[in-house]
C-alpha cells in the first residue's frame, strides 16, 4: 500500500509541477469523495494522500459527490480550498470567466437550487 501511495504522490507532483498546470486559468479538482469532512477510513486515507499536495497547489475549488447530499465547505486551515459537494439528483455546471468560477446546481425541475462564485487565484 505504501508503494501505491508513493507512486500516486509522485504522479500528482508531476502534474502540479507541469507547465500546463502552472499556466492554467482555473484549477478545479474533481474527486468523488470530498476532503476535510469525514471520519471514514477512506476519507482519512485520501486526506493523507492528497491534502499535502493540493493545499500547496493554489486550487480554486474541489467538486465532489459521494455523500449524495449537497454541501459546501469553505476553505479552512485543514483544507485550503473550497469544496462543493453535489447531490445525486442535480446537475452541477461551472463557467470560468471574468476572474472567477461560477458554479450553479440545477435541481430535478431544472431550476437553480444553489449558486457559488470562486475567485481565480
Give the positions of each predicted feature.
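Binuclear metal-dependent phosphoesterase catalytic core
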Residues: 70-121
Amino acid at each position: 500500500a505504501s508503494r501505491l501511495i508513493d507512486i500516486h504522490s509522485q504522479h500528482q507532483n508531476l502534474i502540479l509541477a507541469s507547465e500546463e498546470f502552472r499556466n492554467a486559468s482555473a484549477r478545479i479538482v474533481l474527486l468523488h469523495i470530498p476532503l476535510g469532512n469525514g471520519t471514514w477510513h477512506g476519507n482519512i486515507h485520501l486526506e493523507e494522500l492528497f491534502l499535502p499536495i493540493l493545499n500547496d497547489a493554489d486550487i480554486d475549488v474541489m467538486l465532489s459527490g459521494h455523500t449524495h447530499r449537497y454541501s459546501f465547505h469553505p476553505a479552512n486551515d485543514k483544507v485550503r480550498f473550497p469544496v462543493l459537494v453535489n447531490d445525486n439528483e442535480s446537475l452541477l455546471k461551472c463557467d470560468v470567466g471574468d476572474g472567477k468560477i461560477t458554479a450553479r446546481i440545477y435541481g430535478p425541475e431544472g431550476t437553480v437550487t444553489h449558486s457559488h462564485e470562486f475567485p481565480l487565484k
